[in-house]
Design a protein with these regions (language model features):
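Divalent cation-coordinating acidic motifs and surrounding scaffolds
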Residues: 18-135
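Sec-dependent N-terminal signal peptides
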Residues: 4-16
């Protein structure tokens, strides 16, 4: 009986203290202009989080390449990361951007495909980017 109680106690408090850490960061024009030193700084800053969302990823190829470089840098730090990048928002050329999700694959699992919510594209310049994760 004592062993069962101890096991229950351990499982209860282990699950009670499980946390998922989320970070959201507007990196302002995150693209090819970011140096390797800046990418390393960003990776060192976000690496203790489980899910990272980035706003203002440059809409062109430089933005997708910068997110890929960040994911590579995070993967070199010993934990496996994956990422998804949105299509460009439907804003005017000067306001269009992308978003990105990065996550630790051992902490959370992406469910389905992330999407830009088109419902609001006439009311707002940059529609939100949604994703569902399983913890």
């Amino acid at each position: 009986m004592n062993k069962i109680f101890c096991l229950f106690f351990l499982l209860f408090f282990t699950s009670f203290y499980c946390q998922t850490k989320l970070l959201s960061w507007n990196l302002e024009n995150f693209g090819k202009s970011k140096s390797n030193q800046e990418i390393t700084f960003i990776a060192n800053t976000v690496r203790d989080f489980d899910i990272v969302t980035i706003q203002e990823v440059v809409a062109g190829n430089g933005g997708t390449q910068a997110v890929a470089k960040l994911a590579d840098e995070l993967n070199r730090k010993g934990t496996k990361w994956d990422y998804r990048i949105s299509e460009p928002t439907s804003s005017s050329a000067y306001k269009t951007e992308r978003y990105a999700f990065l996550w630790k694959t051992n902490a959370v699992k992406l469910k389905g495909k992330p999407w830009l919510e088109q419902q609001y594209h006439l009311e707002i310049d940059r529609e939100p980017y949604f994703a569902t994760f399983e913890i």
